[in-house]
Design a protein with these regions (language model features):
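Conserved beta-strand -> loop -> alpha-helix junction used to position metal-binding or nucleic-acid-contacting
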Residues: 139-151
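Conserved non-catalytic scaffold segment of RNase H-like nuclease domains
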Residues: 13-17, 21-142, 156-160, 164-178
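Acidic two-metal-ion nuclease catalytic site recognized across multiple nuclease folds
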Residues: 6-12, 19-26, 169, 188-202
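Transmembrane helix interruption/hinge and helix-loop junction motifs
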Residues: 1-3
Length: 202
């Protein structure tokens, strides 16, 4: 069902942006295996703020069976009201269900293996995760793709390249965005649509 929804969304995205006969998603352009990753944080500065949620979807291009990882992460400081309003993540949720950053990162690094990582905004997410990996004495050396960068090259001149805006143009349900796993689903669709438009991944 996930690939069916993806293909439908890519067709809609293609029509919206190109105003001509829609392109069918060419999933052969995608890596055979890749991991879509999204995080939620307490702010924008990786030197001051912390990860509070990690979501990842390990995609098998030639199968409809994908595996997911979802982890709430306990920060050292309380979550601001603004972040709770944006993500729906509360201090109570983190106290009850969150794990330490070391445990969360070890689980994440095991999950991703050496697969390509796909983010919507790679400089943001990857910087936070690289810094967190250093806390457990690890490095992230996986190849990286940025759906945001690909979208800017695929569809220049848009008013907004926010994930919800791009996904909404494709007719996707964006309710629940700003939670990590939901954003992974949206990112995967935008990534596939941009790859189809560009004729390649990057």
């Amino acid at each position: 069902m996930l690939w069916i929804a993806l293909i439908i969304a890519v067709v809609v995205l293609a029509y919206y942006f190109l105003r001509r006969k829609p392109q069918k998603a060419d999933i052969s352009l995608l890596p055979e295996h890749f991991v879509v990753v999204d995080i939620e944080t307490t702010g924008l500065d990786p030197d001051k703020h912390e990860i509070i949620e990690i979501g990842a979807v390990k995609v098998n291009r030639d199968s409809n069976v994908h595996t997911t990882l979802s982890a709430l992460v306990k920060p050292n400081k309380k979550v601001s009201k603004k972040i709770t309003e944006l993500t729906g993540i509360t201090d109570e949720m983190l106290d009850r269900d969150g794990e330490g950053i070391e445990s969360a990162m070890n689980g994440f690094l095991e999950f991703i293996g050496d697969h390509r990582l796909v983010y919507h905004n790679a400089p943001f997410d990857h910087t936070f995760l690289t810094k967190a990996a250093s806390l457990v004495g690890r490095k992230i050396e996986n190849p990286v793709s940025c759906a945001l960068d690909m979208s800017r090259r695929a569809w220049p001149g848009l008013k907004s390249y926010k994930l919800a805006s791009l996904a909404g143009m494709g007719g996707l349900d964006t309710n629940g965005n700003h939670r990590a796993l939901k954003d992974c689903e949206l990112t995967m669709t935008v990534y596939a649509a941009a790859a189809t438009k560009l004729g390649r991944i990057s």
